[in-house]
Swiss-Prot record:
Component of the RNA exosome complex. Belongs to the RNase PH family. This is Putative exosome complex component RRP41. InterPro entries: ExoRNase_PH_dom1, ExoRNase_PH_dom2, ExoRNase_PH_dom2_sf, PNPase/RNase_PH_dom_sf, Ribosomal_Su5_D2-typ_SF, RNase_PH, RNase_PH_CS. Pfam families: RNase_PH, RNase_PH_C. Non-catalytic component of the RNA exosome complex which has 3'->5' exoribonuclease activity and participates in a multitude of cellular RNA processing and degradation events. Keywords: Cytoplasm, Exosome, Nucleus, RNA-binding, rRNA processing. One of its GO terms (molecular function) is RNA binding. Its main location: cytoplasm. GO terms for cellular component: cytoplasmic exosome (RNase complex); nuclear exosome (RNase complex); nucleolus; nucleoplasm. It comes from the Eukaryota. GO terms for biological process: nuclear mRNA surveillance; poly(A)-dependent snoRNA 3'-end processing; rRNA catabolic process; rRNA processing; U4 snRNA 3'-end processing. It is found in: Cytoplasm; Nucleus, Nucleolus; Nucleus; Nucleus, Nucleoplasm.
Amino acid sequence: MSIISEHGFRMDGRRPAQIRNINTRLGLNRNAEGSCYLEHGNTKVLCAVYGPYESKASKRLEDRCAIVCQYSTTTFSGLERKNRPRGDRKSTEISRLLEKAFESVILTESFPRSQIDIFCEVIQGDGSNLAACVNATSLALADAGIPMKGIASAATCGIVETKPIVDLTSREETDLLPRVTLATICGRDEVILVELQNRLHIDHLSVVMDAAKATCADVYECLAVVAQQHLKACAPILGN
């Protein structure tokens, strides 16, 4: 089956530039400083943030806060059952990508000699998993009251022949489309994460990057509304 039909629709009924619905709930994990449950279409992610707290000597940075991320997936999260939901090569790679991205977002110099732990778990994966984790982490950090440069937003975009498609599903990803996962701050041009999957012709790179940046801006608008509403809801409680 073609990824884009002759009438211009994808397999799930979306247009090429249309993102899936985003639903969130903040503060579900009362043991964490901040948490977020995010549904991006059928992709479902839980994120919990702990800290800042005094770090161990082995991870202590004198001038800033250390960011430690752990990415994992449930054994039933994808199309295939997984025997090692965390600690495998791919999970470790994504954990490092998240760390580097949020080192650029969090005002780490505000908490020298301390550490912030971020745990992301994909409960159900239906494509754009890394992007969903970035978006959930941004809201979990906002829930925790961690000072940031702004809210980070992310999107995964691919290309079919010469046409970009945004917010890929797992079915679209399994077709081995060239794709880019991009994250920016406040939906602007400050890029904090780029991951390229499969070979992408240099002539198509700018097309995919432009589509990804535009999609990050759309996602940011959704996340910003959630963060603002959550802040308003918490304001009376903080005032007391």
